[in-house]
Amino acid sequence: MDETKKGFMQNIGDLSFKKIDETNYEFSIKVEEKFLNTGKIAHGGFIATIADTGMGNAAHIAGGNKRAVTINLDIKFISAGKLNDILTGRVEILKKTKTLVFINCKILNSKGIVATASGTWKILI
């Protein structure tokens, strides 16, 4: 467990995140055994968590490094992430207002799209 992270995020492991430009961000993580469901594929809750985390980080930065909380999150599971896959999230800020950020995300592995996500974050002022 990563003791430098707080709370629930200690369970996620090494999720890397980078800003590409003002509206595009990217994150990645390796699928470990602890992230698998009983069918031996990446658990849907894990996919939702990394989408929420990656998109939330983008909202935080887009909002001027202010705290941002998820208002809604919609996930569509398209294919399976498997053990040792590197999942990459491509995040796009669609619109930002003073207090809201609207975001889309595609999560991919080496074979294509694993999931898509869209959501809205509230910037806490």
Pin down the residues of each PLM region:
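Terminal targeting signals and extreme-terminal segments of soluble enzymes
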Residues: M1-I125
